Amino acid sequence: MAERTNIYYWKCDREDAFHGTSDYQKDQSAFLTVVRKTLEERFGGALTDVVSSCGQGNHRTFEAVLDGQKVFIRTEDGMEKDNYLAVESAVTNRVAALGIPVPETMAFDCSRKQGFAWQVLPFLPYRDLNAYVKDGTIVWTGIAEQIGTGVARWQEISVDGFGPFCTAEAMATGGLRTLHPNYESYYRLNLAKHVRFLVDGEFLSERDACRIMKVIGAHERFLNLARGVLVHKDLAVWNILGTESEVKSFIDWDDCIVGDPMDDLSLMGVTGEDSVTRKIVAAYGRVRDLEGDAGTRFWLCWLRNILFKAVIRQGAGYFKKSSDEFFLIGGGRNGADLAAVTRQKIEKALGALEKGGGFDAL
């Protein structure tokens, strides 16, 4: 069983980097047979109608009926034998206890008796918000308020230390324990490696790389956090289910960490429009303080997040996609457009930090 001690972000730092970021879910008939057998052994005749789902994330996903209820099944079959599904289940139980809408974990098993970990969740009959963004029907007023408030409220969960949680602890006790003693060590983890990857792939220039490291170095005092908060770490419209005007569930917590209170807010900026991010930040600010150095830390989080996302997008070939069918690519656009937006997001963070790092740069 692997811990995430050397992982800043799983999808790009894992040993089998970019596993599950391609089209590997398209033909999984053989794996479906194994999943069906494994779950039938666990649930017997209570489980029926197991079929492949159509997820675009890094888990193979399925749908089924359990005790007459439609359910959603996520599996993790990577070579690292990562069991972070146990952490996710422990975290979402705590988030749900705050009254925040998240999927309830009905059952999970990280024993890997059949070579994979699995998790059973209720099937939620809602589209992700990205679908409404793409077809132009989303109503941001109420949704932005719910997102900002949701982030502020799940930050009530605070654990000593920083970074990813210890999988062994979650599996043994259901408890939460982090893997890094301070925030700066987590923030800088694999940073140079990520920047070098982007330079070697000709996404960034050597000059860009020097500028990035210089800007971060000039602001390193803001990485000295006394205590962190729960961070979703993959917060985006495709990880929120709902209607055109209402959030129904914050999903996919399998990258959650303890980090900076500004992290999840910055992620909404990295993956969305500035006008929407301003609304989300304002909603957050009605619940939690945004004074002091919050603006600078927001842009530091933004920069670190767009860098790891650029690594994933380049490494997984997203910049080469020719249509908007992939969830990351906006309607009517392609991979080249995604590359251009990614560069713009990097430049935005660098420019904001070089000019003082306030929220007015949004």
Region locations from a protein language model:
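Juxta-kinase regulatory segment immediately upstream of eukaryotic protein kinase catalytic domains
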Residues: 2-44
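An alpha-helical support segment within catalytic cores of ATP-dependent transferases
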Residues: 27-46, 139-145, 156-233, 289, ...
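Short, surface-exposed alpha-helical segments at coil->helix boundaries
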Residues: 29-33, 85, 89, 278
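ATP-binding pocket architecture of kinase catalytic cores
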Residues: 51-177
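Active-site acidic catalytic loop and adjacent metal/ATP-binding pocket
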Residues: 60-65, 73, 117, 211-263
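Generic structural signal for small/hydrophobic residues in well-ordered secondary structure
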Residues: 61, 73, 92, 105, ...
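Glycine-rich, phosphate-binding/catalytic loops in enzymes
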Residues: 90, 137-138, 171, 249, ...
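Helix-rich C-terminal or lid/interface subdomains of diverse kinases
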Residues: 141, 145, 224-227, 267-362
